[in-house]
Amino acid sequence: MKKNFFCLLLAWVCAITSLSALDISRLPRQISSGPQGKHHVQGIAYDEKNDCIYMSFTTTLIKVDLQGRVLGSVQGLTGHLGCMALNPDDGRLYASLEYKHDGIGKGIGTQANDKANGFYVAIFDVDRITRPNMDAAEVMTTVYIREAATDYEAKVTNQGKEVDHRHGCSGIDGLAIAPKWGKKGGRQMLYTAYGVYGDNNRTDNDYQVILCYDISKWKKYEQPLSSQNLHQSGPEKPNRKYFVRTGNTTYGIQNLAYDKHSGHMLAAVYPGKKAEWPNYNLFVIDGTQKPKKSNLHGFDHPTKGWTLSLLPQGEHDAKTNTWGFRFPYGSTGICSLGNGYFYVSHPGKDAQTGQQCTTLYLYKWNGNEWHLVE
C-alpha cells in the first residue's frame, strides 16, 4: 500500500514538473515593441500565467502578447518608471519609480511635479490593464522607499570634502523579486538597487547598493500617487542593505534580474569610467554565498556593511579582484525565463518615425557566455 502511494506521489510530482517546465519551442526568438515615443525602454518582465510581456518606457507601461500586439498600456506617469519584476506570490508587477529634480529627472513629462524628491516602488494590478492609455490611478499603487530618499538627500565627507548623496545615491532603478538571500524558495522579497552617480573623484561610490524588503505586509503602506503631492507612506528601514563592490558605474544598476535556475542575481549597468576598474557591462551576484559583515572600502570613517560576492565567472580583473561580463545588452531590460533562458532588450529607434523602441531577443546563458537562440 505504501509503495503504491509513493509511486502515485512520484508520478504526480513528475506530471506537475513537466507542466511547469519551460517549453522553449513556443517562445518567439524576437518580440518587437513598435514605436513608443521619445523615452527609451527601461525594463521588461515576463508574465508566465498570462503569457505576456510588460515593458516600461520611462513614463509609459505597455502590456503586449508574445507577438508584440498591445493588450493595454498605462500612460501619463511624470516620474521615471524603471526596472520591473512580477511577484509570483500575488501576481502583481513591481517597478521602481523616481520623482527627482536632477539632470535626468527634471522635466520628465508635461506636468509640474512636487518640488520634493520621491522614490517609490510602483505596484500594478496587471489583470486590470485591459485597454490602451489607461490612467495610472486605475491600476497602480505606490510605496515610499525612505532609505533611498534619506541617502539621496544626505551630505557626507569623502577625502575630507563635503559631498552630496551618501554612497553616491541617485535614487533607485534596478528591481527584482526573489527569496531571502541564499535560499531558493520561501517568501518572496523585493530587492531594489540604487542608481549611483558616476563621480570619478569619489572613493565611496564603488559599491552597488541593494535594499531588501519583506513585501508580504506592504498593503498597509500602499497609496495612490499624486505627482503634485508626493506621499511618504512606506517602511522606515529595509530588512537588509547589501553592498556589492564592482567599481563605480554610470547611474548604478539599471536592471536587476533574479535567475531562479541558478539562484544568482544579474545586474546590468552602463559601464563606469574610472580607469583603475575594468568597467564591465554586466555583473552576476553569487546567490550561493552568504552575506558577510565587512569593512567597506573608500570611506573616510570606518564603515561596515553586509557585502555580497560576485560570481567567479566571465572575465576577471586581477588588480581589483572583480568578475564580470562585457555583454552590451541588458541595461534596458533583462528577465529570466528559467532553465538558463532570458529575454534581453536591444533598444533602438524606429526607422520611419524616429521614436524609441526595443526588440527583445531570446538568449541562453551557460554561466560563462551568452548565445542567441535560433
What do these predicted regions represent?
Residues 38-45, 78-87, 145-155, 167-178, ...:
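Repeated scaffold domains used in trafficking and secretory/extracellular systems
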Residues 23, 46-77, 235, 290-299:
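Beta-propeller domains
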Residues 27-34, 127-172, 215-250, 293-328:
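Surface-exposed loop and turn segments in beta-propeller and other repeat-based domains
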Residues 108-131, 203-222, 226, 278-301, ...:
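Beta-propeller blade signature
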Residues 59, 98-101, 127, 149, ...:
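Residue-level signature of beta-propeller blades and closely related beta-rich strand-turn architectures
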Residues 29-59, 173, 179-180:
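Beta-strand-rich domains and repeat architectures in extracellular enzymes and scaffolds
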Residues 67-111:
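Blade-loop segments of beta-propeller domains
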Residues 46-49, 86-90, 179-186, 260-262, ...:
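Residue-level detector of Asp-centered blade-edge/turn motifs that repeat once per structural unit
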